[in-house]
Regions:
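A short glycine-rich, His/Asp/Glu-containing loop-to-beta-strand
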Residues: 2-37, 43-44
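Structural motif
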Residues: 8, 46, 53-55, 62, ...
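Ligand-binding loop in jelly-roll beta-barrel domains
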Residues: 19, 55, 75-101
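Residue-level recognition of specific faces of alpha-helices
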Residues: 20, 45-48, 103-106
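Short, conserved beta-strand element in jelly-roll/cupin
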Residues: 25-29, 39-57, 94
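Short glycine-/acidic-enriched loop or helix-start segments at secondary-structure transitions
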Residues: 59, 67, 82-83, 103-104
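Short acidic-glycine-tyrosine-enriched beta hairpin
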Residues: 60-78
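Double-stranded beta-helix
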Residues: 87-141
Length: 141
């Protein structure tokens, strides 16, 4: 089990031996801190909710996904998730190619170091694994 702040990640399949797919279970407690919206330079992502309700956004579409519901994210598309509901949300996340469990271990170490996360280290780690933080929302003039 990999802890990233309040989130729990349990890898079921990591890329290797010719396999490009990564698959993990993601547990998101109610009202937990989650990663900021971001995109993956080269990874497709599929999220399938197993338990609870997960709010998931891909581009401009936001849905509250129930068990059995899914959303997919093409490479380069901004996406994010949250759990504003009263119960734990659990989802199966599939990436191709795999980002790798080591990414989550590194981010977990940065977040778990105490105090506010080191933004420079976090951005460097994200960049190394092909994650691109979304820019701030556009403002009306």
């Amino acid at each position: 089990m990999i802890r990233v702040g309040q989130l729990e990640i349990r890898y079921l399949q990591e890329a290797g031996n010719g396999c490009q797919i990564g698959c993990f279970e993601l547990r998101v407690p109610p009202a937990s801190n989650v990663p900021p919206p971001h995109s993956h330079a080269a990874n497709e992502e599929l999220v399938v909710v197993l338990e609870g309700t997960l709010r998931y956004t891909v581009g401009n579409e936001t849905r509250d996904l129930q068990p059995g519901d899914h959303m997919s994210t093409p490479p380069g598309t901004v996406h994010g998730f949250s759990n504003p509901h009263a119960v734990m949300a659990r989802a199966l996340v599939i990436n191709t190619p795999d980002i790798g469990a080591q990414y989550f271990r590194e981010v977990g170490a940065i977040i778990g170091a105490g105090g506010p996360p080191d933004r420079v280290k976090m951005m460097a780690t994200m960049q190394r694994y092909g994650l691109v933080p979304a820019g701030p929302p556009a403002t009306a003039n």
